[in-house]
Amino acid sequence: MPKHRKQSKIKIYRITSYKKDKRSELDSDKFELEQQDKHDIQDKQDKQDEQNKQDKQVQSENVTIVPTDSHSLDVWDEISLKEIQAGEHTSLFEEKSNYQNINLVQVNDVRLYLDKQLQFSSVDEQIYHEALVHPIMAKVIDPKRVLILGGGDGLALREVLKYETVLHVDLVDLDEAMINMARNVPEIVSLNKNAFFDNRVNVHVCDAKEFLNSPSSLYDVIIIDFPDPATELLSTLYTSELFARIATFLTEDGAFVCQSNSPADAPLVYWSIGNTIEHAGLTVKSYHTIVPSFGTDWGFHLATNSAHVLDQIEQLYVVPTPRTLPALLFPLFQFKEEHLEQRNLALLNSESNLILHQCYKQEMKF
């Protein structure tokens, strides 16, 4: 899970309080947010680098994508982590794995940083994970077999296991260090509710594409919680070819969901992922929710081989009742007009034309 925000005049949200009601212990609609304006950070790239980028522009019919350096991304997460580490805090887990730097810290909340980028805060991680999991799990009839691609912290897994119909879950994550942390650090184990010790769970420490190249039984639900497409390598996780491959692992009435960044801060990335899934031959439904610790809303795409599977999902009541989703899912499928307009600019990300990481860097620059 992954979360990157746009840096230009970014608005940082801090949760100051929340109200409880009988239905919801933590209701995202009732957060009182304190909004703080942060001034722009100066980009110190020299002029020659800028000229080189201009020479490498990627053209599409409606959009010009200019490659930018990734060091300009996610400055606020790095600043936040430094401030935490400089003050009173508890380091719950710290390791440089073969793939990333992992920092699990505790102040008032528990926060996971991967390569200095915030992945979740325990204050509101349920908002993200319930939105990722429950719409699809509630819509697919009696899901028995579930595949989770990514999600090594076990938080999406926790939500999946709430469904009594589920008999078998395969979780695929590349980083064994993440899995070990999620299994053994008490604060994370408390968050994921011992999910990795459920007898229904099978963990596969390998690359998702490697797993998808192996024969397997079909799945009723597939949950894609890949990192954001910040690099060309990560962009390969969001190609039409890979989405088409994932679709072959679905049962006739199965569906998958893909985390897809922010339709507010990265609309070109968000809608391009949806467009790429559609080009793989699937029916797509798009939705989003506000995640306060991310400082923005976050978007997802549902997809299926059979259009009827997602019929009237907006009118769905979710059971088991999540703590943070509205009782009726309809609001999640509504977008502001300015966000919908960006849909017309959506691109196709394919193995022969990897462009999503360039869209991403362009939208995330400051």
Curated annotation (Swiss-Prot):
One of its GO terms (cellular component) is cytoplasm. One of its GO terms (biological process) is spermidine biosynthetic process. S-methyl-5'-thioadenosine binds at Q100, D173, D207, A208. Residues 20-61 are annotated as: Disordered. It holds the Pfam family Spermine_synth. InterPro entries: PABS, PABS_CS, SAM-dependent_MTases_sf, Spermi_synthase. Homodimer or homotetramer. This is Polyamine aminopropyltransferase 2. It comes from Bacillus cereus (strain ATCC 14579 / DSM 31 / CCUG 7414 / JCM 2152 / NBRC 15305 / NCIMB 9373 / NCTC 2599 / NRRL B-3711).
